Structures are given as structure tokens and as C-alpha cells.
Amino acid sequence: MHNIMDNLIGAKECVPMIVVMESGDINRPASKPGDPNPFAGFADYGKTFYEVMIQDLIPMIDKTFRTKTDRDHRAMAGLSWGGRQTMEIVTNNIDKFSYIGDFSGALLLQNLKEDFGGILSRPDEFNRKIHYFFIGYGGAGDFGPSDIKALEGSGIKFDTYESPGTAHEFLTWRRCLRKFVPNLFK
């Protein structure tokens, strides 16, 4: 990732920025061997990452580094389940973020009036508050197309990128990063 960022900054294709990478892979309560429903509690997987991000990580970064702390200068992106975490965190803290990057994210859009607090059913508000919304995915089978289909015609502004010949993998996500970053903080 650092090579991608260094090259983009060096080529003046993006503004210099601080990039923080944290793992939202905070485990869910483990099921017991032989549990008839081993996926019980899966909805809680990574749920405490929200608290870590908002209550601990962002304040520590702002205290430690010379940052611009307003929402216009803060973006969040995530890959796979982290894409869903990104949407949950940003849409519940829209006063802190204005850019969303979803790289093969498991948005699992079902009902725009209910998903993510219903903000996707209010396109005027969403588009006013979110300066850039990016959805990227691997073209050889990945999350993305179903979410894009759910958003089409909704009035939500978003860009998409299909990584050719890749699936749910790091090459997809590196390509997504390369496409997403030049659109930040403009």
C-alpha cells in the first residue's frame, strides 16, 4: 500500500495525506464445538471496532499528528467486511467523515429505507454530506454488483470500478485503492 500512496503523491495525482490502517477484525464471541448454530452472534462480528475507531483511534491520531479534524478532511475505506464496517461507521458518524471507499465490501443492501439507518433512501442528504462514494470489486466474482444494482436509480451518487480478472483478493483491493485515493479531499 505504501508504494501506491508514495507513487500517487509523487506524481501529484493525490494530495498528501495521513493514512492509518487499523484492523477491524475484532472477533465475535466464539461458538462451542458442536453448537447447532455456529453462526449465532455473527452479526456482532467486529461490532466493537466502531467504539475503537471513534472513541480511541481518531482522538489519538488527532492528538498525536498535525491533522485537519473536520469531516471534509477525513475519509474511511475498507475491504471485504471492512467495507461494511466503513459504511456503518461513516453513516452513523456523518459529522466526522465525508468520503467512503468500499473495496469488495459486504454492504449486503436489502432495503435502502432501513440499511445504514435509512440514509441511502435520502439521496439529497447523502449526496450533500458525502463528497465521494466509491464501490470497487473484482470482476471475476465478488461483492459489488448486487449493491450497485440496489443503488442504481436511487439518486445516490457513486463511482464504481471493476477490477478485471480478479475476485475477492488483494490485487482487487490494491487496484481499488489506486482508483479511490485521487478523488479524496478535492
Tell where the protein language model's regions lie, with residue ranges.
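Non-catalytic cap/lid and distal C-terminal segments of serine-dependent acyl enzymes
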Residues: 1-186
